[in-house]
């Protein structure tokens, strides 16, 4: 085993960080120690994870994550359509002037209102009830599902709740996993809005896959197949 790889694996940070990466977490610059560790040992860890048929990726925005191949040896799971849509809205908010005005902090209510204003509400309600007529009960259930999606994305490192207040959160640069197609261009926010309204928030196989089940899904989101925590809701 190469000496520097041995040093990386022996580092006290590695066990917990390895578990987080395998669970689909994105490691951004806000996680100072973990991010610095990945920067220091990026080349060695790329070789290490290649043995499991996954790639250690450093995105243009600087965050790290694991991208599996179809033959990966690491268990995989996928995000739902609603998770994907919430992620797209988070990316849109990240690009908005309001993020600077609010010091990067948004509330769950603001997210929900933005979701309703940008996406087709009738389609959103289908996530709750395929035969939804737009009842108040269905709308309440939709709001609950949005909260569940937001919490799932938090575990993937897309947002951070503000202390013990789970109604407010800060968006991280990792949300660009949901906006790979808008990284270039004159108006990123307009491109993201177009993707949401055109239905492109729903990727192939209806999922942003952190541990996706096929190479086709790896192509969606600008070749950004992801690894998501396997959850039982």
UniProtKB/Swiss-Prot annotation:
Gene Ontology annotations of biological process type: cell division; chromosome condensation; chromosome segregation; DNA replication
Keywords from the named record: Cell cycle, Cell division, Chromosome partition, Cytoplasm, DNA condensation
Localization per Swiss-Prot or TrEMBL: Cytoplasm, Nucleoid
Domain of life from the UniProt record: Bacteria
Signal peptide: none
Ranges where the record places region Disordered: 207-233
Pfam family, one: MukE
Keyword Cytoplasm: yes
Function summary: Involved in chromosome condensation, segregation and cell cycle progression. May participate in facilitating chromosome segregation by condensation DNA from both sides of a centrally located replisome during cell division. Probably acts via its interaction with MukB and MukF.
Similarity annotation: Belongs to the MukE family.
HAMAP family (alphabetical): MukE (MF_01802)
Protein name: Chromosome partition protein MukE
Gene transcribed to yield this protein: mukE
